[in-house]
Amino acid sequence: MYVALAKFDVFSNISVFYPLTSRAAPAYPLPPPTTLVGALAYPYLRSKCSSEYYNGYSPAVKLLDVVYYASAGAYAYHIAKDVERIYQHVYLKKPHWRKLEMAFTVSVRGLATYLENELFVLYVSKDRKVLDYVYGITRIGRKECHVALRDIVIEKLENVISHHRVFNTIFYTPTAIAECTRAIKISMPKLDRRNFSSTTQPLLDEYFVPNGLEPMECELGPRGLLVEIDGLSIAIPRL
């Protein structure tokens, strides 16, 4: 098993919406695990010339066989909303397609910004070669959410396991593996293949998420492992 810790420069706001909500709903403070796997799947699948859909699922579902866990963190974040111009012809009936005045509309969308425009992402995978595709990640979430890899560290999992039980972390952490303070609780889609289909009932896990101002203080439970890599502490579920 291998661990990759990546640091990204974020060039625009990150917008990842809660499942089954409108565009105007608040965005997640940090990209959920399914979004992180989707970001990794994009360069991976382009190199494989893969199809857009895979037996009714997003092609990103193929990575679930090798990617065990994913998480994101930032030293501080801010949640806000913005107004954007949206192309809407594709959502209208055909008689309206020739009307230029109906081509665009406006919408409010949620977004997250990060301190110094830095976002950290952790992947745990049994396939070392898959982690090389982190170098090809150029967007996280929507196509307009551009990022660039600044630095990456890839290690064998057994080389970065820590035996500390109490730790501070900027990464969201499943409530099932640790107890955290200075945190909020948010439910996010977990890495399950059903969450990569057109489901109306997404499968969610509950996570402790930093409050946006400071790292969380956590105590590891029996179902978790603590990884310390490049000066950061991240709790992951036991294998």
Regions found by a protein language model. Name each.
Residues 51-66:
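Short, glycine/acidic-rich hinge or "gate" loops at secondary-structure transitions
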Residues 22-29, 56-57, 85-92:
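Structural preference for beta-rich elements and adjacent junctions enriched in aromatics
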Residues 1-53:
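N-terminal ordered "arm"
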Residues 64-239:
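Internal, well-folded beta-alpha domain core
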Residues 42, 59-62, 136:
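Charged/polar, solvent-exposed surface patches and flexible loops
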